[in-house]
Amino acid sequence: MSEELLKLLKAEGLDLLSCMHCGICTGSCPSGRHTGLNTRRIIRDARKNRAAVLSDYDLWLCTTCYTCQERCPRGIPITDAILELRRLAVREGLMLPEHRFVSEMVLECGHAVPLDEETKKKREELGLDPIPETVQKDPEALEGLKTLLKTCKFDELVAKK
């Protein structure tokens, strides 16, 4: 199974086999200092066990700052590999509940965090329009966004599998 994953990654120009497990990626990771993210382990797991790496919560802790990738002595595109692993995970229905919720909000109202009545009221108190110049204010733009998301099959990716 890991050979299949490595082939998929290599097809994207992401060859992980040259990793020498020096740990520079993990040691320089800002997110790893505060979370369980261990980029070296993710790379190792990608080489060994596809199922484990695609369902690993830590895969989603990367902030995509590219520090690991910039510092890798072998020039391994670590962040790019993590992003591709995430794409593969989503295609297999392995999306975190929080990401699924936010994605469903975007599909429904065009925003990850829709405006509630309290926020609209607070905006008015601050002298702002209750609804900012976004797709929430323009029904045609919202429908256009929904069409775009459907056309690129975002709704199918978000659907529970």
Curated annotation (Swiss-Prot):
Pathway: Cofactor metabolism; coenzyme M-coenzyme B heterodisulfide reduction; coenzyme B and coenzyme M from coenzyme M-coenzyme B heterodisulfide: step 1/1. It holds the Pfam family Fer4_8. The keyword Oxidoreductase applies. Its main location: cytoplasm. Binds 2 [4Fe-4S] cluster. Its EC number is 1.8.7.3, 1.8.98.4. One of its GO terms (molecular function) is metal ion binding. Belongs to the HdrC family. The ferredoxin/F(420)H(2)-dependent CoB-CoM heterodisulfide reductase is composed of three subunits; HdrA2, HdrB2 and HdrC2. This is Ferredoxin/F(420)H(2)-dependent CoB-CoM heterodisulfide reductase subunit C. It comes from Methanosarcina acetivorans (strain ATCC 35395 / DSM 2834 / JCM 12185 / C2A). The gene is hdrC2.
